[in-house]
Amino acid sequence: MNLDHGCSNINYPEITQMKKLYFLTLVALGFSANSFAQSFVTATSTATIITPISIAKNLDMNFGNIAVNPTTPGGTVTLSASASPVRTPTVGLTLPAVTGLVQAASFTVTGEGSSVYTITLPNSISLTGPGAAMAITPNCSVSTLTSAALTSGTQVFYVGGTLTVAAVQVAGAYSGTFSVNVNYN
C-alpha cells in the first residue's frame, strides 16, 4: 500500500521548526496584548512644615496676702484665671486690705495660625515655706484644655487656682513651681 499521496517532498524537521516559530509568535502576541492592557498614572507627594508651637511665661501666679482666722479650721482661696483676677476666700480665711501682689499666671502660646492645641497643667501645685506645704488645684482661662485654638497664631491664657490653707498655717512666704505644656492636636 502506498501512503505517499504525492507528499513525498515534505521535510518534517521544517514543520517542527514552523510549529515552534508559530508557538513563539503566539506567546509574543500574548505578552504584547497584556502590555496594551496596562495603564499607568503619576502622583505627587507633598509635605507642609508648620511653625513649631512654643510657650512663654508672662506672669507668675500670686495669691497675695491671706490671713487665717484663729478660731476656724482653715479654708481655701480661689484665684480666678483672668487678666484681672478675683480672689474668693472661704469662711476660715480673710483677705486683708493690703492685698499684696495678686495676679494669675499668664502665658503666651505661638504657633501655626488656626491650629488646635492641648494645654497640660499639673493636677496639683505644692507651695512650701516655713510651715506645712499648701496645695493649689490649678484652673485655666481656656475652657477646653484639649482644644484651644491659635486663631491668629498667638494666644494668651491665664492660670489661677484654689489654694488650700490649714487652720494652723505658719505665717510666712510660700512658693512652688509648676510646668505648663502645649502640644498640637
Enumerate the language-model features and the residues they cover.
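Sec/Tat signal peptide C-region and signal peptidase I cleavage site
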Residues: 16-17, 31-37
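Cell-envelope/extracellular anchoring and linker segments
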Residues: 125, 134-136, 161
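Sec-dependent N-terminal signal peptides
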Residues: 21-31
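Short acidic, flexible loop segments centered on an aromatic residue
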Residues: 119-126
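Short helix-onset patch at the extreme N-terminus, typifying the N->h transition
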Residues: 7, 24-25, 42-45
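Short beta-strand and strand-turn-strand segments in soluble, beta-rich domains
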Residues: 131-142
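N-terminal small/polar-rich segments of proteins
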Residues: 38-119, 147-185
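Short, Lys/Arg-enriched N-terminal segments with co-localized hydrophobic residues
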Residues: 1-17
